[in-house]
Amino acid sequence: MKKRRGPSEDENPRPEKLFTQKVFDYISRVILKYFKKTYKFIIYILKNLTLFKILYKCFPYIKNFILKIDKIFFHVLIKSINFIKYIPQLIHDKIFEFFWFILKIFQILIFVKIFKYVIKKFIIY
């Protein structure tokens, strides 16, 4: 007699695996959407040389602004580390990685928004 085997995991995935897969798919779609927009925006900038020259003139101001934002992010990170250092080491490492990841995502998104704002502000059509 042959032993009946159950369905494989690929045919019938467990609900928690399905949920994590959906979450991962959603996050990757959102990130791709933002990167596609910025990629198109950068190509648009590179096509217009006058725009590129204006950006080149504005670069020191943009750079200083980004450095200030970096200092703010670093300050927030230090505050969160001081808060977290009372938690046991293993949890602390995981939370630190999580905070670092979140801060980097926010930094990228804010940089993109600032970049777009500066472009709109300094360009006169």
Swiss-Prot record:
The keyword Plastid applies. Keywords: Plastid. One of its GO terms (cellular component) is plastid. It is found in: Plastid. This is Uncharacterized 15.7 kDa protein in rpl14-rpl12 intergenic region.
